[in-house]
Amino acid sequence: MNTANDIDRLYNAIEINEKTFQFFQIDLQSYGIQEVNKGSTQFFYILLEIMNGKFNCNLVFIVNCYDELGKIIYSNERTVYVDTYIGYDTLKFWCNDTNLIDRTNKIRVFVRKG
């Protein structure tokens, strides 16, 4: 079930570590939350739209979810391969765990060398 309150709360919880994107000269064009589901296993998607970039290695984009105490309760990553990246991509992260929507207080997104 999609609830506007959960979508808004999760979207507002996203923090982008801009320094890591700037290091690789990647422009984050847009991001969002999609398909919030509070079934038996709660899940949602985080979407990132990226452009440009100057790098000569594979990059790993990481999404970490934190609880109200600041503990990491979930992590997911996607790799962008230097050989296939043409200057634009949309990355989709599936975040799923028991009560993950209710437990997530902050979401941090960053990029590192792969």
Which residues are covered by each model-predicted region?
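Short, cysteine-centered beta-strand-loop-beta hairpins and adjacent loop/turn segments enriched
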Residues: M51-N56, E68-I72
